[in-house]
Amino acid sequence: LMKKFGRFEIIGETRDDAAGEAFDKAAKMLNLGYPGGPAIAKIAAKFKPTSYNLQATIYKLPRPMINSGDYDFSFSGLKTALLYQLQKMASKEIKEKTPALCAEFQQAAADGLVSKTIKAAQKFNAKTVLISGGVAANELLRQTLAEKLKKEAPKISFLSPAPKFCTDNAAMIGLAAFQKSRRKSAFKSWRALRAQANLRL
């Protein structure tokens, strides 16, 4: 939750795998390569459900913690459910049904992210929902969040950067450091700075 630029409060986070990590691991299970998000989205786009091939009734994956009552996420269970599903299938079937599996995995991940995000935005009277990071490049997530916000919370605006900016990069870290340096209480001298790989915002 950002009340003003550079001031954050964490109200929800993953309890295990990050969303992007779950996509990467799922793609590895399906032999789709890395990074997993774009690979799964590309194959999922090939799935066209029909009355004889209903996605929801063939490979229904769980939506972990979607009704947990808090704003945390979990993707480990979703990843494990996909693994168990693959273990029940022959190699030929996996190859034939990969688009359906990708579509369901992608939808399950998006459902969890969208549901928790909207609930949090409503609870804390957010004016705007902004998505960022690698998973924010996922078109299904962007579209689903935009549509559900418009339907369930029409007064909350939605912002999403162009997909090419939805990556980890030095520029965003540099900007964060620059803004922090402008606050005199942040640090006294750059010489006293120490690298911390797990530094929180």
Predicted regions and their residues:
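Acidic, glycine-enriched active-site microenvironments
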Residues: 1-201
